[in-house]
Amino acid sequence: MNNTEHFGKLTERMQAFREEVLDAKPYIDAQRAVLATEAYKENQNQPRVMVRALMLQKILEGMSIYIDDKSLIAGNQATKNKNAPIFPEYTMEFVMNELDLFEKRDGDVFYITEETKEQLREIAPFWENNNLRARGEALLPEEVDVFMETGVFGMEGKLNAGDAHLAVNYQRILSDGLKGYEKRVKELRAALDFTDPESIDKNVFYKAVLTVIEAVRDFAQRYSKLAKELADKETDAKRKEELLQMSKICAKVPYEPANSFREAVQSVWFIQLILQIESNGHSLSYGRFDQYMYPYYMKDINEGKITKEDALELLTCLWIKTLTINKVRSQSHTLSSAGSPMYQNVTIGGQTTDKKDAVNELSFVVLQSVAQTRLTQPNLTVRYHANIDKHFFDECIEVMKLGFGMPALNNDEIIIPSFINWGVKEEDAYNYSAIGCVETAVPGKWGYRCTGMSYINFPRVLLLSLIHI
């Protein structure tokens, strides 16, 4: 038996769905940019945090939605799979400079229609010197410009787009739902003392959080309604039932807590998706997926509500949906980030906070699902340690033999002591996950780009040093 046969094949529809997504031509998508521009224009008097919340609300209310006919999960980033939205609040400079070059680039080719070009030309003037890149460059010393122009170091990705590199607290989202966050925020807001000047900023922040929660809830409800409409027209009995179930689930999560494996998967996907609709950050990672999803998986298995095969198909669908997320970078940025990578990392294995092996039944299912899909997304990372389940580790080796570069291995024996030496609490150190390419972080507790980032061209530094000796 070869390695491919060892892990089994995708179901027929997931194989077809996979091929559809892989074959999809990536287009530049202007819809988000147009909606974001309208939101910024309408709310110029608002504090920035409120502008961002209202922008997300407008996008989630106005963007096109659809449900793929082979998908078990609802939620799309753009008007079509693999389309790349534009985020004008970061910059429009490279977008306008490359408007007629996207289809001619050496790497990361994107297609663009004349209609899209016209839409982008119409909104571009509003963003001139009114974006993240412009403000960032205004803060930099003149010497930095020289070093950037001569290639000593670069920050193209940081100036042109979000960078994320974090894993959110999915365990809490699943157990509390956004409804739990809403309750907490309302309590904090009600307790504000407005004789304290800091309460002004806190109140604005709380208001923004409540706006976002409402927007996310309504976004999921849009899919609930769409799934019901599709179900009413569906003639295939099995698909009709799936759409009705999808409608029911989307009416509930992520606002309400998840109570089943299917609800948990849909809830996680909505949050994973919306964060990238809002911020354009890559390396938005799933965290310790087999740990926070395990209770929902085992509950459904024990109650006979789902089989391992059902869960396997659902996870392969999730990974295919993960591949639909796309991001356009400037041509110069593609020189170091070719292939439109999104670095959405999934971590399995490792240890529990009481130092026991964390491998469970779902760890094997996740591993098998990634082996079956064999995609560039998500990045799969296995946390290795001295007492890891031997059979599980052997299975990891078998996946590596498939030759698509996964899973990566993180060594708990090195990483956990290092975190503790840096002052990270032991329970957090044992709960770390991979984010992005190879970085590590504590899910839900470490924020944006906590690992730092800089591209330094050391040979260029040496060359300049020799010139000036």
Residue ranges and their predicted role:
Residues 216-220, 288-289:
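Helix-boundary capping/turn motifs
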Residues 2-206, 242-245, 249-467:
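Conserved catalytic cores of very large enzyme subunits
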Residues 207-218:
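Extended non-globular scaffold/tether segments
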Residues 217, 224, 228-231, 240, ...:
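Heptad-repeat amphipathic alpha-helical coiled-coil interaction surface used
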